[in-house]
């Protein structure tokens, strides 16, 4: 058996995008291609050669190619789903591939899925009050499973998240749900360096358009943010914890 066949296979969607492209750049710059076989979904033909030159296996297709996604998920040990947190069909196709892999090969892969903090939003009837004055405010804790399980299915991104939860409940994959708030900063590396966040440029555009910066109410609202480089590092930390440290455990 060659060293290549011993490598764990990573499959990433959104690999030429803002978050996924930043993750890919960090992996390539740190020689992850020596330890992993990395494949990335690409929609544009001109990205195929770019990925090949980086040592990445291009998978030509889109999120609408359900059979392709199922096939790739079935082959992967680790999946980064960073393309679209509202594309339910692609998430279901990936989970189907992981389910087949588990039942046919007895292998439980790792699925790291990108959702968004919009899933925690609620309706507002005005400027609101501070958390200390709001007796119905909910403080979120990653360790509080029951609170997260109670999020209604009509919340933003939630229908897709439930596809990931299904894989976890069935025990066919080890799942991680990434729920970043506003991601800011220029993308990292050649695949993502020309990409920026959605929210911050919109705020800047509105400021330029109205020739003044605006705020809501008294300006005391809290808006969490994370830099795209820090977020990419978190994905790799999960990859490390689920592969390197676990494989070293007795």
Range-by-range predicted roles:
Residues 39-46, 62-63:
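N-terminal Rossmann-fold cofactor-binding loop
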Residues 52-78, 86-90:
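Conserved Rossmann-fold cofactor-binding substructure of NAD(P)-dependent oxidoreductases
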Residues 202-226, 234-238, 245-249:
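A conserved pocket-lining segment of Rossmann-fold NAD(P)-dependent short-chain dehydrogenase/reductase
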Residues 161-193, 201:
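Conserved beta-loop-beta element that borders a ligand/cofactor-binding pocket
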Residues 184-196, 217-229:
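Glycine-rich "substrate-gating" loop/helix at the edge of Rossmann-like oxidoreductase active sites
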Residues 4-33:
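N-terminal Rossmann NAD(P)H-binding glycine-rich loop of SDR-like oxidoreductase domains
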Residues 185-201, 238-250:
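Glycine/proline-rich active-site loop of Rossmann-fold NAD(P)-dependent oxidoreductases
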Residues 74-139, 154-159, 163:
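NAD(P)-cofactor binding segment of oxidoreductase domains
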């Amino acid at each position: 058996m060659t060293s290549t066949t011993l490598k764990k296979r990573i499959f990433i969607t959104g690999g030429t995008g803002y978050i996924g492209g930043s993750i890919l750049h960090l992996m390539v710059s740190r020689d992850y291609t020596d330890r992993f076989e990395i494949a990335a979904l690409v929609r544009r033909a001109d990205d195929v050669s770019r990925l090949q030159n980086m040592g990445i296996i291009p998978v030509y297709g889109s999120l609408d190619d359900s059979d392709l996604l199922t096939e790739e998920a079935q082959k992967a040990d680790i999946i980064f789903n960073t393309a679209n947190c509202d594309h339910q069909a692609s998430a279901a196709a990936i989970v189907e591939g992981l389910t087949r892999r588990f039942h046919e090969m007895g292998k439980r892969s790792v699925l790291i899925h990108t959702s968004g903090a919009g899933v925690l939003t609620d309706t507002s009837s005005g400027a609101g009050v501070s958390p200390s004055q709001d007796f119905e405010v909910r403080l979120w804790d990653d360790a509080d499973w029951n609170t997260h399980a109670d999020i209604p299915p009509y919340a933003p991104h939630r229908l897709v998240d439930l596809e990931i939860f299904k894989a976890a409940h069935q025990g066919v994959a080890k799942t991680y749900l990434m729920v970043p708030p506003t991601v800011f900063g220029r993308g990292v590396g050649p695949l993502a360096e020309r990409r920026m966040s959605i929210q911050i440029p919109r705020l800047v555009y509105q400021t330029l358009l109205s020739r003044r910066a605006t705020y809501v109410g008294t300006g005391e609202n809290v808006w969490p943010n994370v830099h795209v480089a820090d977020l990419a590092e978190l994905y790799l930390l999960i990859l490390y914890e689920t592969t390197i440290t676990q494989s070293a455990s007795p």
